[in-house]
Amino acid sequence: HEGGMKIDTEVRNVGMKILSNIQDKSFTTVHWTSLLLYKFNEHINRYVNDFKMSNFQCAINDIQILKYTKGGHYKLHCDHGPAVPRTLSLIYFVNEDYEGGDLIFKLINTNNEIKIEKKPNRLIIWPSNFMYPHCVTPVTEGTRYSVVAWAL
């Protein structure tokens, strides 16, 4: 379940721990959540400046740690929707010692796609809108860890 919502494992098969708005008030959890919020917001500000998005304001709404084991995947989707109007999406790659589990962006109105190279300590930021449909291919070996976040 995700926030009381049943997850269809045919669409999304991944272990998840939500960090923001968490009930666990342990010092370690609060510390890591605060550090991630600080770093992600720092990179969002750089992204906004690099793309000259004047008067653009948003803040991290949700942070999740994801664990994809063998067979774990996420079918093609966009992060923005009517229930959660996300503006920017972020993914932080933790490790690379797994096979499969590729982050792929599909270019709309074409058959082309962009496969993001696996690199630990890499942060990818993109607009959450319909122009950036993406998926995670099934993991075939090892375990894929990542941290994802969204800004509203």
Give the positions of each predicted feature.
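Acidic, glycine-rich loop-and-strand cores that form catalytic or ligand-binding grooves
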Residues: 54-69
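Eukaryotic intrinsically disordered and solvent-exposed regulatory patches
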Residues: 51, 77-78, 132-134
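Short hydrophobic/aromatic beta-strand micro-patches
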Residues: 93
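Conserved short histidine dyad/triad with adjacent acidic residue
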Residues: 65-83
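Non-heme Fe(II)/2-oxoglutarate
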Residues: 1-56
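Catalytic core of Fe(II)/2-oxoglutarate
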Residues: 71, 82, 86, 97-152
